[in-house]
């Protein structure tokens, strides 16, 4: 998207070149606000790529950094920052003392995540240490109609943490206690700032583990809020299947509980599932109860190289269709392997590779491994290498989890535009083939990693921030890939969430009527639109 100022409009104008089909009225609503009488209207018929000039009504301010970094029409939402009254900041400082900061460095730290967007930071940061303190901040925010954004470790890839309307960032990283381990029931309750590595370290003595492992050492609160998954999802599922209950602070500061530790319930609406994946727009999660699993008797990992990405993907599809209960099945293309070798000082063969792991009894693991080897050989797989010791497995999986940063370090100074499509397993080969051909034709550097066992893969396009044409190319490729995935009955995001980046795709995937229903829920639970405004969709 190209945005530049125009002169004829007294209150300031913005020229926007759109790179995709979109609803003209929805875009204008996002820019002017729903109640502006000066907004020109036209039919809701979608319009194709063109340039329009719109005038911002007097009395509002536009965050130019958001405009200049926007890449899709939907990102022009929530550009007007809300004023945070001085008396609210003063009240927070009196209540939280040094745990309420307006220092520029602290605000900047909480105004960035791993997404490529740059917007102004929040007006203040509060380091909360309890559910009651989160509720106190929200009571004040409700009184003054000030936005609030929850912050865990800052690993979002989709702009979830960005204060697009200003406001207060609530840092919950100090809420990092494991509250209750119920090993007989295979559950644990934690505060939102507990990270996955911390949790597994603290419960290791029980013989149990928590399997969900996104690439970053993310917080459990953030993982629940984005409905995250990871390399183990093919066997253990995602956060959607593994969260049993939540404690949530609402927009008015009320504390509610959803769900129980029981394995099933038919009691009323399933508010737990509503909150899981809501990206902090319906409430702030302050406790999470999740399932645990017995540590497997035997674990073995292997890598296998293939002559092509297509051969690796077809191997994966056959493994899943045969019902092999594989625990992990990860794809790295040659570019990703090369980057990992450089970053982690490994010497893996630089060819498309599957990295797999098997859990179970010794006999079961041996049987699974034999079936997988036979299938891989049918598709040209070779050089099966086994990692049987914990140290060898840890080294391989650490390298896999670092692939994102390894890819970036291979092109110093670059940023990434990362895809997150997920398709039915039977359509995976077709989707990846289309993506690879289009990426090769475009000429941008890229690498591919994927949780291909459940149909989810990521292409990271590496771009020079100083070259807007590269950003535009990457977004065009991302858009094309999403549309391919949707035609194949897949989704625009398997695990990263919508955030700022994928809002236009949400309408493409679900339809406008479905998004309107989501808006109805949002307005009912957050009538002042103070909970992480501007994410998922515009109001």
Predicted regions and their residues:
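Intrinsically disordered, low-complexity segments enriched in small polar residues
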Residues: 11-15, 33
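Intrinsic low-complexity, disordered N-terminal segments enriched in polar/charged/small residues
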Residues: 1, 14-16, 27, 50-51
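C-terminal substrate-recognition/cap domain of FAD-linked oxidoreductases
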Residues: 101-112, 293-294, 300, 305-480, ...
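Intrinsic-disorder-associated, low-complexity terminal segments enriched in Asp/Asn/His/Tyr and depleted
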Residues: 23-25, 30, 35, 48-50, ...
């Amino acid at each position: 998207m190209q945005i530049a100022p125009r002169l004829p409009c007294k209150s300031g104008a913005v020229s926007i070149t759109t790179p995709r089909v979109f609803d003209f009225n929805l875009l204008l609503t996002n820019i002017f606000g729903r109640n502006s009488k000066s907004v020109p209207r036209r039919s809701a018929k979608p319009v194709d790529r063109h340039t329009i000039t719109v005038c911002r009504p007097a009395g509002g301010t536009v965050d130019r950094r958001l405009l200049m970094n926007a890449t899709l029409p939907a990102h022009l939402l929530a550009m007007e920052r809300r004023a945070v009254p001085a008396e609210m900041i003063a009240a927070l400082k009196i209540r939280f003392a040094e745990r309420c900061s307006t220092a520029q460095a602290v605000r900047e730290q909480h105004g960035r995540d791993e997404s490529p967007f740059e917007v102004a930071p929040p007006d203040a940061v509060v380091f909360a240490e309890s559910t009651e303190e989160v509720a106190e901040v929200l009571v004040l925010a409700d009184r003054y109609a000030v936005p609030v954004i929850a912050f865990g470790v800052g690993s979002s890839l989709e702009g979830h943490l960005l204060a697009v309307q200003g406001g207060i960032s609530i840092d919950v990283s100090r809420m990092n206690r494991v509250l209750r381990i119920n090993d007989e029931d295979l559950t644990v309750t934690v505060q939102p700032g507990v990270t996955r590595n911390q949790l597994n370290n603290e419960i290791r003595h029980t013989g149990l583990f928590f399997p969900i492992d996104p690439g970053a050492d993310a917080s459990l609160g953030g993982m629940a809020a984005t409905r995250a998954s990871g390399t183990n999802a093919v066997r253990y599922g995602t956060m959607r299947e593994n969260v049993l209950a939540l404690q949530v602070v609402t927009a008015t500061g009320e504390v509610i509980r959803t769900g129980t530790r029981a394995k099933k319930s038919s009691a009323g609406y399933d508010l737990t599932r509503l909150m899981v994946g809501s990206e902090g727009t319906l409430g702030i999660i302050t406790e999470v109860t999740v399932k645990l699993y017995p540590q497997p008797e035997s674990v073995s990992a292997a890598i296998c190289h293939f002559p092509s990405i297509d051969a690796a993907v077809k191997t994966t599809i056959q493994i899943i269709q045969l019902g092999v209960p594989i625990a992990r099945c990860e794809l790295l293309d040659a570019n990703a392997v090369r980057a990992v070798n450089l970053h982690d000082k490994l010497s893996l063969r630089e060819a498309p590779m599957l990295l797999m792991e098997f859990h179970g009894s010794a006999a079961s693991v041996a049987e699974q491994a034999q079936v997988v080897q036979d299938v891989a050989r049918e598709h040209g797989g070779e050089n099966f290498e086994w990692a049987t010791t914990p140290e060898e497995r840890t080294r391989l999986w650490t390298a896999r989890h670092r692939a994102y940063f390894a890819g970036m370090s291979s092109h110093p100074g670059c940023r990434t535009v990362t895809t997150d499509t997920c398709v039915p397993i039977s359509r995976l080969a077709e989707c990846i083939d289309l993506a690879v051909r289009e990426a090769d034709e475009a000429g941008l550097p890229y690498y591919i990693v994927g949780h291909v066992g459940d149909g989810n893969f990521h292409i990271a396009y590496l771009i020079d921030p100083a070259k807007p044409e590269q950003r535009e190319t990457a977004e065009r490729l991302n858009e094309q890939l999403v549309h391919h995935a949707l035609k194949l009955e897949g989704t625009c995001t398997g695990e990263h969430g919508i955030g700022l980046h994928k809002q236009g795709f949400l309408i493409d995937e679900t339809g406008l009527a479905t998004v309107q229903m989501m808006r109805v829920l949002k307005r009912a639970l957050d009538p002042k639109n103070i909970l992480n405004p501007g994410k998922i969709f515009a109001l």
